[in-house]
Regions:
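Internal catalytic-core helix/loop-beta-alpha segment
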Residues: 106-143
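Active-site-adjacent structural segments surrounding the nucleophilic cysteine of cysteine proteases
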Residues: 1-99
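Short, flexible/disordered intra-domain loops and linkers
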Residues: 64, 122-126, 157-160
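Short, amphipathic alpha-helical segments
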Residues: 38, 90-94, 126-130, 142, ...
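Non-transmembrane alpha-helical segments in soluble domains
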Residues: 48, 101-104, 137
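Mature extracellular "passenger" or substrate-interacting domains of secreted, surface-exposed proteins
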Residues: 33, 40, 103-106, 112
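Active-site signature of cysteine proteases
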Residues: 130-134, 139-142, 149-217
Length: 217
């Protein structure tokens, strides 16, 4: 099984250097603390920008001006005010979804948020690879990127610990669950099944989706 977003090209964004990048980079922030702790709001900015382009009701989330050359950093700064890291970064997945929902409300849009927690190895039963696959598949089928929070990277050499990244595609193979992520202005592929087996601290998958207005009676 393979699933991807309908318009991955919408995830190509212009950085402060004037060059196109897959996704965004927290190092674009101006402040040193933001550059250190800004993976969560950076992931949120990328995800909300994509939603604004593919779901017409969510267009106000990121109007074209927010995506213009040289303007995306200002959009990241706007997101920071809602998806705001604390002393330990943005370590609560519910804070991520609630921040996105609050930002959406500030622009007249409604979102719904869902979280699949993956506890640390010694604190309870983890969701299976199949459960993670189903969560990801439902989000991608709805044309919504997924935010992946990773507290410890396990045996994955290309994934930072204590880190948020947007997840934009998935391919299931025999004993592997290959996921495409955007990280540091680059596209990478990780094996989520291997991460589930080897990460000691776990993490979470989070998704925000359009919440349709109730129909008028």
């Amino acid at each position: 099984m393979s699933l991807t977003l309908t318009h991955p090209e919408y995830l190509t964004l212009t950085g402060p250097d004037g060059q196109p990048h897959p996704g965004a980079d927290q190092d674009w922030y101006r402040d040193p603390w933001q550059r250190r702790a800004g993976c969560g709001p950076t992931a949120a900015a990328v995800i909300l920008t994509y939603l604004s382009r593919v779901h017409p009701a969510l267009a106000p989330l990121a109007p074209a001006g927010d995506r213009a050359d040289g303007e995306f950093l200002d959009y990241m700064e706007a997101i920071w005010s809602y998806v705001t890291p604390g002393a330990r970064g943005l370590d609560n997945p519910e804070s991520f979804t609630l921040g996105c929902l609050s930002f959406a409300l500030s622009r007249g849009c409604l979102l719904d948020g869902q979280v699949l927690k993956i506890p640390r190895r010694d604190k309870g039963t983890r969701p299976t690879a199949e459960a993670c696959r189903d969560f990801l598949a439902a989000a991608l089928a709805a044309d919504c990127p997924v935010a992946f929070l990773n507290y410890s990277s396990g045996d994955l050499p290309n994934l930072d610990s204590w880190h948020w990244v947007p997840l934009i595609a998935l391919t299931e193979g025999e004993e592997v669950l290959l996921c495409t992520i955007l990280d540091g202005g680059e596209e990478k592929v990780i094996d989520l099944a291997l991460w589930l087996e080897t990460s000691t601290l776990g993490g979470a998958l989070a998704v925000v989706t359009p919440d349709p207005l109730p129909e008028e009676g």
